[in-house]
């Protein structure tokens, strides 16, 4: 039986190229490709994020009220501060220190993001 891996999470956006720049600046993701159709970003590991624009035919509209994945960051407080300083709506850090700390934020398209410390 072959192993299973999660390869990408899809997030609907209005402009994949602009959104890719924001995700790169705010979360340190590497832009692999970006077009009017979509943008693929990656970080450490094998998973990626695919930002899907209207030209892709995706049926979901930007502004998801729930996170399609979580983003593991090295410094939760620093990431939260950077997002807030750059105008993103951010929630309070919550969770249990011995299990997982997290906060939510919104990207410029209003999609909910979940950022975690593990």
Regions picked out by a protein language model, each given a short descriptive name:
Residues 69-83:
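Mid-chain, well-packed structural core segment of small domains
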Residues 20, 39-40, 88, 92:
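A generic "structured core" feature
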Residues 1-20, 47, 67-71:
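N-terminal beta-strand motif that seeds the catalytic metal site of vicinal oxygen chelate
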Residues 19-24, 83, 110:
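Conserved active-site tyrosine of GNAT-family acetyltransferases
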Residues 30-64, 112-118:
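Conserved short beta-strand elements that form part of the metal-binding/catalytic scaffold
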Residues 1-2, 8, 85-118:
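Vicinal oxygen chelate
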Residues 39, 67, 99-103:
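Short beta-strand micro-motifs in enzyme catalytic cores
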Residues 28-34, 89-93:
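Short secondary-structure junctions
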């Amino acid at each position: 039986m072959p192993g299973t891996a999660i390869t990408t999470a899809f997030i609907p956006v209005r402009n994949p190229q602009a959104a890719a720049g924001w995700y790169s600046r705010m979360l340190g993701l590497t832009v692999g490709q970006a077009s009017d159709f979509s943008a693929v970003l990656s970080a450490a590991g094998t998973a990626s994020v695919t930002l899907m624009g209207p030209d892709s035919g995706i049926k979901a509209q930007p502004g998801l009220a729930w996170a399609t994945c979580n983003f593991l960051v090295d410094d939760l407080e620093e990431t939260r501060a950077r997002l807030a300083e750059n105008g993103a709506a951010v929630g309070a850090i919550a969770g249990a220190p011995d299990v997982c700390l997290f906060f939510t934020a919104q990207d410029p398209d209003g999609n909910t993001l979940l950022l975690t410390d593990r």
